[in-house]
Amino acid sequence: MFEISLSDPVELRDADDAALLAAIEDCARAEVAAGARRLSAIAELTSRRTGNDQRADWACDGWDCAAAEVAAALTVSHRKASGQMHLSLTLNRLPQVAALFLAGQLSARLVSIIAWRTYLVRDPEALSLLDAALAKHATAWGPLSAPKLEKAIDSWIDRYDPAALRRTRISARSRDLCIGDPDEDAGTAALWGRLFATDAAMLDKRLTQLAHGVCDDDPRTIAQRRADALGALAAGADRLTCGCGNSDCPSSAGNHRQATGVVIHVVADAAALGAAPDPRLSGPEPALAPEAPATPAVKPPAALISGGGVVPAPLLAELIRGGAALSRMRHPGDLRSEPHYRPSAKLAEFVRIRDMTCRFPGCDQPTEFCDIDHTLPYPLGPTHPSNLKCLCRKHHLLKTFWTGWRDVQLPDGTIIWTAPNGHTYTTHPDSRIFLPSWHTTTAALPPAPSPPAIGPTHTLLMPRRRRTRAAELAHRIKRERAHVTQRNKPPPSGGDTAVAEGFEPPDGVSRLSLSRRVH
């Protein structure tokens, strides 16, 4: 058992530098050891929840059931919980590496890389040899970068199971566009990715063309206009709206926007609608002033993109000035029970804006991609805001078919979840955080009888997978191993050989002159 004596923070004030660094190292080892034990518990829970083959082809299977419990316990998303479960299984596949991890001698980062690089190794003998080699050498590798660690691990995989080397996809297959987390202060987000060179060149020219399509009084720099032009393209615009504000601007003539099927919902407090645009959002960097002007002690409340980041009040004012449509939310007191299973558009809008994300513990799926669930199943429970909440499809299926989960809803939208193990988790509507002045409490509902348990004759049917999770995993591993094996085959011997016309070998490789065999 790994044990360590941690210094009291008060004692560290009188410690010398060497003692402080030693305390840092000891605490880091303790964190690693604690993390390893957390993964051991996750691995055991995963094993218990995935042992039922009768539900293996369910769309929400035993793995999802375990992931839901892990996500609730750690307050993380379903996807992150699933990733922790995959990582935890490495402790079972590589016991010697796991022992070092539990002792705090291998970092979580290194174990994560080992888990990924050895994922295709399935032969027990190769795994045993690889486990012993990695356990022997990993502690001596020192602080290597991720690429160097991957190469070091791959060298041992290549020795014991060459077909298990993870293949690196060529750049063309790695095409993607990624959007980073929003900057809450600036209301911006980073964008990066990889395109075909032809598409990139076309996009570059198109952005420059749009950036130069405004009048000279536009306060934005060319770089800022190019960035805004990308947003205009996403909205289906054929031109960039000029920001000069002049009524007689020649660039403002005509319709600059075309109808699109893309709508972005921004939820804002009424007080935020009166904010003034910030002229410093655009234009060159201002010169440094001797004394910065005083800023108000209280800023206008910000708005929130549905499923996205915060929109500062000045940026919201720019959007409104640019023609964004406004729709005022009805007061929840105006909402009543409805006679049908599906809520009306107004009631659904209220529930989605109130919740903002899936209401399962740790889930952050935006409500626009969620189902609206009756907490007390219809018709025992009414179609009323005090009985409705948003759940993503995965957690909706989990609640409906995995009957170990129970939930109770309060009139203010609070949900109290009880897990199969008896632990309780309380979630609140996100609007309580981002729109604190919005009163969302609705009428309390009378007590209702407990809903009937779902049995074999229940009319609802769980969607089924085409392949079980285990079969899909085996299929993917087989395909990737086959690809690696094909890639590692030696070139065919014999037959016609010739130097390709115009071929130039890489640097450091000698060119061989081959004669054509005459038959």
UniProtKB/Swiss-Prot annotation:
Give the species: Mycobacterium tuberculosis (strain ATCC 25618 / H37Rv)
Protein name, UniProt field: Uncharacterized protein Rv3776
| Segments of skewed composition (Basic residues) | 477-486
Q: Where in this protein does the record put region Disordered? A: 477-519
A GO cellular-component term linked to this record: plasma membrane
Q: Which InterPro entries match?
A: DUF222 (IPR003870), HNH_nuc (IPR003615)
